[in-house]
Amino acid sequence: MDQQQNFQPLAESFYQVPTLELAKNLLGCILVKQTEEGTSSGVIVETEAYLGNTDRAAHGYGNRRTKRTEILYSKPGYAYVHLIHNHRLINVVSSMEGDPESVLIRAVEPFSGIDEMLMRRPVKKFQNLTSGPGKLTQAMGIYMEDYGHFMLAPPLFISEGKSPASVKTGSRIGIDNTGEAKDYPYRFWVDGNPFVSR
């Protein structure tokens, strides 16, 4: 159901926790994007943690520092938007300044602005609207221009939601060429939610 709500960004202190903790805490929170068409939001139902320097699956592995990854070295709470196979993905920078860690938002459950989401991403099956990291950015109007936005203010931020009743943990998806890192249990999802990517 499309719902109207006065969303307020989470405080900066919310992001100032270890990355694995943040990945779990984000479940149930509401991702919000304001555009000219209106405000779209979704309840975060799936995340993945990437632990920077020591995590072969992370863009900051080995302290790689490029123009693309520079924002990962900022303080927590910034948006790291990047392209993979022409799909935009949104991560929340985590840990502490100088430590290139982040949390990927893998899936959300549509909450408000659903008509606008369907205009951006027409789907036959509603469940496919935001059930993956590239799907949710397309549906919500999250673009490369959002890279480096500090998520404590509009147009892109995260708002308080409700803690899920049950959370599952498992290995991350789509990182088969990263050695033992592919088996790390750094993916978190809301048990039983139909918008989880798999």
UniProtKB/Swiss-Prot annotation:
UniProt keywords (A-Z) are: DNA damage, DNA repair, Hydrolase
Q: Which domain of life is it from?
A: Bacteria
Q: Name one Pfam family in it.
A: Pur_DNA_glyco
Record flagged with keyword Hydrolase = yes
Q: Which GO terms describe its molecular function?
A: alkylbase DNA N-glycosylase activity; DNA binding
The record ties this protein, via CDD domains, to: AAG
Could you tell me which InterPro entries the record lists for this protein?
Formyl_transferase-like_C_sf, MPG, MPG_sf
**Which of the seven top EC classes does this enzyme belong to?**
hydrolase
This entry's Enzyme Commission designation comes to 3.2.2.-
Any single biological process term in GO: base-excision repair
| PANTHER family given in the database record | DNA-3-METHYLADENINE GLYCOSYLASE
Q: Please name the NCBIfam families in this protein's record.
A: 3mg, PRK00802.1-2
Family stated for the protein in its record: Belongs to the DNA glycosylase MPG family.
What's the name of the protein? Putative 3-methyladenine DNA glycosylase
What organism does the UniProt record list as the source?
A: Oceanobacillus iheyensis (strain DSM 14371 / CIP 107618 / JCM 11309 / KCTC 3954 / HTE831)
